[in-house]
Amino acid sequence: VVMVQKEVAERICAKPPRMSLLSVAVQYYGEPRIVARVPAGAFWPRPKVDSAVVAITPQHPSTQAPEHLVETEHFFRVVRAGFSQKRKQLWHNLSAGLQLDPINVKAVLKEVAGNEKIRAEELTVEQWKQVLRCWGAQVLK
């Protein structure tokens, strides 16, 4: 449980199409939810922003089916590449950032998301995992 600025709490708990590297990172490890909003007037001296309390329910690997597990280091390597240039289409960021064939990247995105022109902020955490599973060891090079 943490208290952060309201805007940060909203970014942590975001769903597609408003995902960010922060929301993907937190949601990889657990399920966040805003449990309370705290107005700026509740503090002295009064800050310029409202706050929110975020509770994160951890997701332990032992509770996940084996087909849903991915290597953490590789997962974040792919996600960081995907969010490297926010307004670019995801296939461009992944092919450039991971030195992968653009045609292969587009095919995987079409399979996972149904759209090869998707942007990073439009994928769920599970879809990011599916992308990584489709490539397997290919992105480890």
What function would you assign to each model-found segment?
Residues 1-120, 130-141:
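Class I S-adenosyl-L-methionine
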